[in-house]
Curated annotation (Swiss-Prot):
One of its GO terms (molecular function) is rRNA binding. It holds the Pfam family Ribosomal_L9_C. It comes from the Bacteria. InterPro entries: Ribosomal_bL9, Ribosomal_bL9/RNase_H1_N, Ribosomal_bL9_bac/chp, Ribosomal_bL9_C, Ribosomal_bL9_C_sf, Ribosomal_bL9_N, Ribosomal_bL9_N_sf. Keywords: Ribonucleoprotein, Ribosomal protein, RNA-binding, rRNA-binding. One of its GO terms (biological process) is translation. Gene3D superfamilies: Ribosomal protein L9, C-terminal domain, Ribosomal protein L9, N-terminal domain. This is Large ribosomal subunit protein bL9. Binds to the 23S rRNA. Belongs to the bacterial ribosomal protein bL9 family. GO terms for cellular component: ribonucleoprotein complex; ribosome.
Length: 148
């Protein structure tokens, strides 16, 4: 069965991709959940138009992502959190906490899903946090966790 994906499907493809899947998988899972539509000639033409518009938008988004990366590059973010005697935090610092601290420090609004914490932040100290702004642009934020 030939389908056009409307959403990202792990292991299968991204929106706009034309994929060949088993009939049951397409009919019982992908189409009812609106992850895909049937691949007709009209739908394929429409997908090509959408892809052209998306590529033009991606160029604009790349410039915007580079601008935000420049803003984040020189930003030092301080986050205060409750901690015990040995510097161990009560809980941990989450991506949402990092976004809130960046905004409070005068940085741009970020999406918490774009913030990557490679290891959980569970103690006081200095950390480097990666922010994926665009597939080609990743910014780093210097985060200082201090005791409240």
């Amino acid at each position: 069965m030939k389908l056009i994906l409307t959403q990202e499907v792990p292991g299968l493809g991204s929106p706009g991709d034309i994929v060949e899947v088993a009939n049951g998988y397409g009919r019982n899972y992908l189409v009812p959940r609106r992850y895909a539509i049937l691949a007709t000639k009209g739908a394929e033409r429409q997908v090509e138009q959408i892809k052209r518009a998306r590529s033009a938008r991606a160029v604009r988004d790349l410039g915007h992502a580079q601008e935000i990366a420049g803003q984040l590059g020189g930003l030092k973010v301080e986050l205060t959190s409750r901690a015990g005697k040995e510097g161990r935090l009560f809980g941990s610092v989450t991506a949402a906490d990092v976004v809130e601290a960046v905004t409070a420090a005068g940085g741009p609004e970020l999406d918490r899903r774009r913030v990557e914490l490679t290891t959980p932040i569970k103690s006081l100290g200095a950390y480097t946090v990666a922010v994926h702004l665009h597939p080609e642009v990743t910014a780093t934020v210097k985060l200082q966790v201090t005791q409240a």
